[in-house]
Amino acid sequence: MQGDPEVIEFLNEQLTAELTAINQYFLHAKLQDHKGWTKLAKYTRAESFDEMRHAEVLTDRILLLDGLPNYQRLFHVRVGQSVTEMFQADREVELEAIDRLRRGIEVMRAKHDITSANVFEAILADEEHHIDYLETQLDLIEKLGESLYLSTVIEQTQPDPSGPGSL
């Protein structure tokens, strides 16, 4: 099915954003895990996987419209060093995505591609949920301070008795 070139470009632009977010969130999850913020790392890793699902849906839609998914470009990956910087960087990605998705929905509806608009609306709902989470975490950091906040995202685990060195 031949799709509109402008719609396909919006789909590809959002695909680029999702591929970038996958990398950024996955790296942040690894940094968080390395720093011992294991509960936070699990959440961030899950967000990376959510972005992967978005990329899959966008890829399928682009292919259905006889377009070529562009996996060769990425936007700038913003890497935070502190938890606050990570949340701020991730918030920027989400704000940009929300703006792009809203613009895309308008174009898709104007071109009568309701299915692509529905795909963007579903992704938009997920991104709005994620930005709400990020803003809540940033508010908590502002109220509690970064050190106290971090004490809430550490998960103490017991050593695995069947781990290395066991028989």
From Swiss-Prot:
One term of GO molecular function: ferric iron binding
SUPFAM superfamilies assigned: Ferritin-like (SSF47240)
Top-rank lineage group of the source organism: Bacteria
Annotated heme b binding sites: 52
Residue numbers binding Fe cation 2: 51, 94, 127, 130
Cofactor note: Binds 1 heme b (iron(II)-protoporphyrin IX) group per dimer.
PROSITE patterns, A to Z: BACTERIOFERRITIN, FERRITIN_LIKE
Assembly information from the UniProt record: Homooligomer of 24 subunits, arranged as 12 dimers, that are packed together to form an approximately spherical molecule with a central cavity, in which large amounts of iron can be deposited.
Function: Iron-storage protein, whose ferroxidase center binds Fe(2+), oxidizes it using dioxygen to Fe(3+), and participates in the subsequent Fe(3+) oxide mineral core formation within the central cavity of the BFR protein shell.
UniProt record similarity statement: Belongs to the bacterioferritin family.
Name of this chain's protein: Bacterioferritin
Organism of origin: Streptomyces coelicolor (strain ATCC BAA-471 / A3(2) / M145)
